[in-house]
Amino acid sequence: MLNFFAAAPKGFEYSLAQELTEFGATEIKESVAGVYFTAPLALAYRITLWTRLASRIVLVIYKGPCESAEQLYNAAYCIDWSSHFSNRNTFSIDFHGTGGFINNTQFGALKIKDAIVDRFRDDGDARPNVARIDADIKIDAHFRNGVITIAMNFSGPSLHQRGYRSTTGEAPLKENLAANMLVRSGWKAAPTTLLDPFCGSGTVLIEAALMAADIAPGLQRSRFGFEHWRRHDKATWHEILEEAKARASLGVKRCDVKFYGSDIDSRLVALAKRNAQNAGVLELIDFKVANALNVEPPAGEGYLITNPPYGERLGSVSELLQLYYQLGDKFKKEFGGWKVAMLCSDIELISALKLKADKQMKMFNGALECAFNLYTLHAQSTRRDTPVLPEGVDIADIAPAFANRIKKNAKQLEKWAKKEGIDSYRLYDADIPEYNVAVDRYLDHIVVQEYMAPASIPEAVTKRRLSDVLLALPAAIGVDPHKITMKTRERQKGTNQYQKLDERKLELITTEYGAKFKLNLTGYLDTGLFLDHRLTRRLVGQKSKGRRVLNLFSYTGSASVHAALGGAKSVTTVDMSNTYLAWAKENFALNDLSGKQYEFVQADCLQWIRDSALDKSAQYDLIFIDPPTFSNSKRMEDSFDVQRDHVNLLGMLIKLLSPNGEIVFSNNKRKFKMDTETLAKMKIKVENIDDLTLPMDYKRNPHIHNTWLITHA
C-alpha cells in the first residue's frame, strides 16, 4: 500500500473523501484543502485518471517531525531517491510553509535539493540536474506545525485541466469546481435532464456529460507525473487506460440523459460547442444562443445548475439585481418540479432571487468565496403562458415605501428642474431612514450612494435593503437598470474626495443655468459636480461682473465657470489636484472660455493663502471658498479642521479681500458653529445665507451645507 494526498480547492474535502471511498481507497482522512488516503499502485492510477474533484495527487514519501535545518536535511537524505528516479531525470522542488527555523520557502527547497544530490553522490551516482521549468520529477514539500511532508507529484499538471478546453471565456469556471457543483447538488447521484441557461464555455454541461457517459476526465491528458517514476508499472497503466477508452466509447452510445445549454453570447456558445467536441460529448448536448429569461424549461422535470454572472464591475449591480429577481420569478412560475443549484459570489444578488434555499454551501471559485445554494421548485408552481417579465418590471412588493417616496419626489422635481434649466438633481436623500441612500439623477442616468449604516444594524439587513432599493428603482422612476451606478459613501476622511474608484469612464455633459459641466459617474466617489452647491455657484456668478474672482479648493472649477460666464474681470482657480485642475480647464473649454484672465494654480490651498496674504498686491473682489471638513492629505503640510481652523483661515483671507469685496464661505460640517464674536473683534462681518443657497431638491436635508457672506466690518 502507498500513501497519498489528494489536493483540492477549499470546501471540496467532504466531496473528495466520498469520491475516494467510492474508488476503494482506505485510511481516508480529510485535511485542509485535501484528503489523505492509502491505495495500491493500480488503484492510485485509476484514481488519478478518474477523479473529477482532485486538483493534484501526490505520493507521500516521508512525513515526520522537523525542528531544525539539520533535521530537514536528514529527512530528505534518508529517502532512497535512486529508487524513485534516475540521475538522468531532471527534478524540481515546490516548498510550502514557513515558521520556526524556515524564514522563506527558498531556504527549505534548497535544503531538500542539497540532500537529494548528496544522496545520489554518496550512493555512487552522478547528481541529477534541477530544472525550474518542466522537470521530469516534481517534489512537493510542506512544512506545517513542526512537521515536514515530502512527496512526489504523482498526477502531474493540475487535474482540473482535462484537455478539452480550447480557450476560455470571460471568468471561466474550473472543471473540478463544475464537477463539485454536480456532486453537491445531488445530480451526479441520479443523473437526469440538465439545463444551464448561462452555459458560457460549457464547463458544467461538459462535466455532467462526461459523468453520464462514463468518460474518465483524465482520458485526454497528454502527461502524468508518474511517467518518469522508476516504480511506474507501464503494463498496469496501459490496461487501465484501455479500459477507460472502451468504457467511454460505449458510454456515449448508451447515454440517454438530455443536456441543454444556452448563453446570450454567441461567441461563448460557439466555444462551448468546440469544447464539447474536444471532450467527445457534443452529440449529447443541445446548445443554443438565447437570453436566459427567454429559455423554456425542457419537458418533464430536471436540474437547472448554473454559474450566472456576478460582475465585480462597479455600476453593474442594479442591472444584475434585476436579472436575478426576474430569474427567481421565472423559476417559480415556469420550472415547477425542478431543482435549481446556483453558484454566486454575491449574497445580495442571490438573495434577489427571492427563493428559499433548501441548502446553502460555501465553495471557492479560485480565490473568490462563493455561495452554492440549492432550491426545490414545488410542482404546484407550474409553467405559465404569459411572457417573461420585461426589464422595467413592476415589483411593487419590493420596498414599496421607498418606491412610492422616490416616485413622488421624481414627479415633483421633474417639472421644477425643467423650469430651472438644470438636468442633474437629487431625487432622494435618506428620506426614509431604513433606506439609507442618496439618489441623484444626471440626465437619464442615476447614481445611488449608500451611506454607512450604524454599527447596530446587521450587515445582512443593510445589504438586503440596498438590494431592494436597486430592484425597485427602475420601475419606480422609469430608468434602465444599466444606467444605474452604485457607490458607497462613508464619512469623509481626509482625501476621500480624491480617491479614484474605477478605470472605466462614464462621462456626460450636464447643463446648469446655461453653464456646461463634464461629469464622470464612475471614476471617482464624486461625479465632478456638487449638486447641493448649485445656487451657491449661481450666486457667485451673479456677483462676479467686473470683479477679480478667486476660487479656492476649487475641485473641478464649476464655480469659476459661473464667475467667468457672469462677466468676471479675472478668475483664479486654485486646487491641490492636477487631475481636478485639468478637469476645470475642460469645463472652461466646454463653455468657450479662454484667455489670460483665467488662471489655474496647482497648490496646497492653505499654504497658497498664507503666502498670498503676505503679498500686499494680491487683492480680490470676490472669493469663493468651500474647504473640506477635515483634511490630512500627504501633500498638505498640516491637518485642517474647518471648525477648529476657520477663524485663522478667514483672518488670512480677509487680507486678500479688496475694501468692498465679499467672501462666500461654505462647508459641509453639519454642526458647524461660526465664531462670530472672535471674527467681530477682527473687524470681520459675517452673515449666514443658507436660505439663499439651499436648492429645492435639498429642502428635505437643510443641514447639507452652511454658507456665509463675509465682508470687512
Swiss-Prot record:
Localization of this protein: Cytoplasm
EC number: 2.1.1.173, 2.1.1.264
Enzyme class, spelled out: transferase
A cellular-component GO term for this protein: cytoplasm
GO molecular function, one term: rRNA (guanine-N7-)-methyltransferase activity
THUMP domain span: 43-154
Protein name: Ribosomal RNA large subunit methyltransferase K/L
UniProt-listed SUPFAM superfamilies: S-adenosyl-L-methionine-dependent methyltransferases
Family: Belongs to the methyltransferase superfamily. RlmKL family.
Organism (species): Shewanella sp. (strain MR-4)
